[in-house]
Amino acid sequence: ALFYYSLLSLSFIITIKILLKITSRRLKNLPPGPPTIPIIGNLHHLKHPLHRTFTTLSQTYGDIFSLWFGSRLVVVVSSPSLAHECFTKNDIILANRPRFLTGKYIFYNYTTLGSASYGDHWRNLRRITTIDVLSNNRLNSFLGVRRDETNRLIQKLLKDVVSEGFGFTKVELRPRLTEMTFNAMMRMISGKRYYGDDGDVSDVEEAKQFREIISEMMSLLGANNKGDFLPLLRVVDLDNLEKRCKRIAKRSNAFLEGLIEEHRRGNIHSDGGTMIDHLLKLSESQPEYYSDHLIKGLIQGMLLAGTDTSAVTIEWVMSELLNHPEVLKKAKEELDTQIGKNKLVDEQDLSKLPYLQNIISETLRLHPPAPLLLPHYSSEDCTIGEFNVPKDTIILTNVWGIHRDPKHWNDALSFKPERFEKEEEVNKVMAFGLGRRACPGLSLAQRTVGFTVGLLIQCFEWERESEEKLDMMEGKGITMPMKIPLRAMCKALPIANDVTK
């Protein structure tokens, strides 16, 4: 018995030594990083805003550095060349997502487009999204919806101005922009409006419930959940994050199921052209794949990724224009020349407005809606630059830092739309990601932002509240909104009266 016990002990020791040797070999030549604290690693570096924290760390440790969040290795990439290497040479290896608490509960156990790891299911979701949901033909079919919601925005601003006697009137754009983008997306998805005070909200109680769900989801997605890295904290759940995730997931699921059932029963007055209608038609021929579960995940993804981001970007664009009146003047001149002083701009006109496109590109460079790309996860060992990156490493790309790096941008912190007159400069903007997991909603975002900003410039004269420039500091939130919401003075121009529902 003693012999067998000794043999077993020896085998155990040899196995542990082999595992430690393999692990140490894998962990050799990691990117450099700050010192760690026992157990928590570098969790004390999880300070908001993360993109600024990581930019500061990159100035000490270089364009690629390591952090240990508990027992999980995180590699932060802060240069365009390394980011391109991640999503070209290592694109498939880094095409997975880490498993966080929100993915388990809110994103249907990691099965939605944004949370699923690379594989057949994700490829099918991507195909459905690009071909059936966000194709150019599909987006063109909803042009009337987007035009109507943008016109409503202009009309409400016009009403605000008229009520004050047609002179310069103080307006706050954020609530109006949020209302416009969410209503446009919900009408494309389900044919319903849930925001606004213009008497055209489909169901007041249902609308209130929807707004509460979206608000809570945004709050949870922006939460700093250390339990994702220290399992003990998840068990304790001091912040009640797990309970909140379960609760909002249940509410969201019931809400989305209700929407789908309404369409299935034909209780919603639509022409059958909404995204839900289209997906339900596909489910008739392929019910095993186009399940309610899949449809709910697609709807949720469009709402969370395609609404707040556009509203936030439009607010940043208008703020930069107010801080740079010479740029605003040049944009107005382009609209007058290319579209005409008596003709309202439309989505189809955006290709004629290169300077407006440059303004938007420069805004996305300085104020990307996702300052850190969604986290990637390595499925096997790889190298990035000269460093080893082991399997099961979380990769974070600091787009905000890359976009403001003076090594890669001339006069990097200045707002200069003219820099994008060189066509190759546009390709350096990473606001919508890179590689196979880049955001599929790029075309919709470009249409929404370009059309809305064009109309705001055409229909109103804009000024700051005072001589002092606007505060361009970012606030909290996954989409990096302005810390201080934009308040500006606007005065209606005659062409604003041509806007009709």
Swiss-Prot record:
Matching Gene3D superfamilies, A to Z? Cytochrome P450
Output the Pfam families linked to this UniProt entry: p450
Q: Which GO terms describe its cellular component?
A: endoplasmic reticulum membrane
Residues reported to bind heme = C439
Subcellular compartments: Endoplasmic reticulum membrane
| Essential cofactor(s) | heme
**EC code:** 1.14.14.88
Tissues of expression: Expressed constitutively in leaves and stems, but not in roots.
Membrane topology annotation? Single-pass membrane protein
Q: Out of the domains of life, which is the source?
A: Eukaryota
Stated family:
Belongs to the cytochrome P450 family.
| Protein name, entry field | Isoflavone 3'-hydroxylase
Q: Which organism is it from?
A: Medicago truncatula (Barrel medic)
